[in-house]
Amino acid sequence: MQGFRDRVQQNRRVQRRMATCFCVALFILLVSLSAFFVLQFEPVQRKYFYVYPYHDTVMKYAEIYHVDSNLTAAVIKSESKFKHTALSHRGAVGLMQLMPETAEWIAGQIGDKSYNVESLHEPDRNIRYGTWYLAELQREFKGNDVLALAAYNAGRGNVKAWMDENNWSYSFHDIDAIPYKETRDYVRQVIGDRKKYRELYPE
């Protein structure tokens, strides 16, 4: 008789533990689903994950230089998270993380005689130069955004060398074949972010 009571009590303890585990699992599932749906809510994404400061400036230079404004926004997000004071350990400056020597060359190309390194922290100038440079890379790589973005990250010289070494054509789209992991990740990130900006900020 005592053995029967012990088995009953043991079964009850097991059932209580199972019920507790089920409740905890259900709670976690509900919290996860709630978080997922909140994160899918467009105003939340725009406010916290895909912010868009300097929207008018981006649009202005995108129109002037015939660049997809969503691409420019995605590059800025990846490069600086829209922080105009950003300065990398390599010396890249501002919203679009331009190297001073590249910016000086761009200034010469567009005839901006007022350029100096400090002025790269100015949002308008940085976005202007960065957008012009994106347009130049797209022209150089025949409109191929994968190659243009790889060049923006790793340098046009490296991309030209990869094309020669691997017989890549201007129709190249195999991001996995890019030798640098940082550049592979960068290209994927920017292309994915461009899609999100296009969805969240339809023109």
Named regions from a protein language model:
Residues 1-17:
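N-terminal Lys/Arg-rich, disordered targeting/topogenic segments
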Residues 21-39:
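Hydrophobic membrane-insertion alpha-helices, especially the h-region
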Residues 36-203:
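Catalytic glycan-binding domains that act on GlcNAc-containing polysaccharides
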